[in-house]
């Protein structure tokens, strides 16, 4: 079965560069190896915390004051990604992949091309009868423990939903699940983002 990295960001405000926490779940051959959350210190010019965001994720400015910057955090992800050449999984890649792109550009980080899979997009195709396809709704449906907007918990829930999607279709990889619905995995590289599409 597939190996991949599930990610989830929380941001201090509406700017993608204000990422203040990152949840990472490493999956190898269908087994969750580890789920971690790391706080991220946003660049100074994007570090103002919006009270609305705080009410969602409960992260305070004091908690990221001495946190590593994204370029340091990225080294951990890149080590696993480059070693295994694995795709990323996100629940609504329109946010998480755009945050990743913005931060990679800001810190001028060179990186291998990243393929990505959107559990939200596939959930809409796989379970059209569900009233919605939000992460917390799917977690409840599949008895997945979730502390919503805790980045580590969100990333792990995303990983488990991705594995559920593989299991339902009896496939071996995220790419095969996507192909089942006529999609190709999305791509993030130095030229920009190519969304997961069926075109």
Which residues does each predicted region cover?
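Active-site metal-coordination segments of metallo-dependent hydrolases
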Residues: 128, 147-152
């Amino acid at each position: 079965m597939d190996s991949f990295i599930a990610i989830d960001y929380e941001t201090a405000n509406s700017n993608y560069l204000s990422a203040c926490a990152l949840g990472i779940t490493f999956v190898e051959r269908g087994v969750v190896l580890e789920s971690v959350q790391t706080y991220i210190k946003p660049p100074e010019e994007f570090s103002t915390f919006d009270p609305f965001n705080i009410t969602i994720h409960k992260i305070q400015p004091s908690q990221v004051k001495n946190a590593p910057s994204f370029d340091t955090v990225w080294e951990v992800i890149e080590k696993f990604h480059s070693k295994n050449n694995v795709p990323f999984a996100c629940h609504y890649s329109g946010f998480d992949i755009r945050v990743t792109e913005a931060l990679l550009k800001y810190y001028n980080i060179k990186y291998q091309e990243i393929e990505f899979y959107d559990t939200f997009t596939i959930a809409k195709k796989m379970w059209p009868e569900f009233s919605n396809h939000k992460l917390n709704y799917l977690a409840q449906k599949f008895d997945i423990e979730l502390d919503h907007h805790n980045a580590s918990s969100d990333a792990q829930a995303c990983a488990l939903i991705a594995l559920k999607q593989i299991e339902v279709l009896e496939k071996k990889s995220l790419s095969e699940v996507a192909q089942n619905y006529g999609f190709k995995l999305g791509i993030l590289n130095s030229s920009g983002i190519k969304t997961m599409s069926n075109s």
